[in-house]
Amino acid sequence: MAQKKAGGSSRNGRDSAGRRLGVKKFGGETVVAGNIIIRQRGTKMKPGSNVGLGRDHTIFALVDGHVKFERRAEGRVHVSVEALPVAAE
């Protein structure tokens, strides 16, 4: 009797959704305090002035202003927010 056992299932066929990382606000764009500027894995870009660093390395604005990217001497890009002048009442 010629017989063949059932073949095992393929080990492929899975994929995970993208993590939506990257720059969310580009240089010169206006941001409000709390806006996410960059979502990243590790500190590919470092925080400068008026920005915070989340525990997942997200860089976010601490003040209202304009985003500024600058390359420093050590070769890393630093992200800052230049604060908008406060309107006199």
Curated annotation (Swiss-Prot):
<feature type="region of interest" description="Disordered">
    <location>
        <begin position="1"/>
        <end position="22"/>
    </location>
</feature>
<keyword id="KW-0689">Ribosomal protein</keyword>
<keyword id="KW-0687">Ribonucleoprotein</keyword>
<dbReference type="Pfam" id="PF01016">
    <property type="entry name" value="Ribosomal_L27"/>
</dbReference>
<dbReference type="GO" id="GO:0022625">
    <property type="term" value="C:cytosolic large ribosomal subunit"/>
</dbReference>
<dbReference type="InterPro" id="IPR018261">
    <property type="entry name" value="Ribosomal_bL27_CS"/>
</dbReference>
<comment type="similarity">
    <text>Belongs to the bacterial ribosomal protein bL27 family.</text>
</comment>
<dbReference type="GO" id="GO:0006412">
    <property type="term" value="P:translation"/>
</dbReference>
<dbReference type="InterPro" id="IPR001684">
    <property type="entry name" value="Ribosomal_bL27"/>
</dbReference>
<protein>
    <recommendedName>
        <fullName>Large ribosomal subunit protein bL27</fullName>
    </recommendedName>
</protein>
<dbReference type="GO" id="GO:0003735">
    <property type="term" value="F:structural constituent of ribosome"/>
</dbReference>
